[in-house]
Amino acid sequence: MKKITPFFITLLLLFISQTITSQSIVINEVVASNSTINQDEDGSYQDWIEIRNNGTTAVNLNNFGLSDDPVLPFKWTFPNISIGAGQYLLIWCSDKDRAVAGSPLHTNYKLSSAGETITITSEAGVTLNTVTTPAMLQNISYGRIPNGTGSFMFFNAVTPAAANGTVPYTEALSPP
């Protein structure tokens, strides 16, 4: 039997450490029909996904995938950016396909207000978090309560790149 080299052990520990650390990344809030909430840097009202790092250390998102297609987990990939411990990151789902570190991020797809499944995948191909959104009304978000860890509920007061509100609703009804 061959000896395991210290180099191999170091690589294995780094891989395990990165996998464990990256599992603290969650989808925290989604808006799939933004008509008046907040504008992107072009002045457009675009749908968005907010992710949160629930961990105690920063996570580098380089080559992580974000997708609305279960068959294509790397439909859009993050540039070489990190998200700090307890921090939020807003990704516009605009079909503009912008992935430049230090600039607003835009996926190469838009979200469906009819509902869909959104997945974030680590560079190693591990599914970190998946959420299936229901049909969504305009300017309503679907987010976690308690923030970052709980079940998904609807919010009238959306909170892009910030902690979710404290008044959630179990369903969103169309105006009469």
State where each predicted segment sits.
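N-terminal signal peptide c-region/cleavage motif recognized by signal peptidases
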Residues: 16-17
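Intrinsically disordered, low-complexity linkers and terminal tails enriched in Ser/Thr/Pro/Gly
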Residues: 20-176
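Bacterial N-terminal signal peptides that target proteins for export
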Residues: 1-9
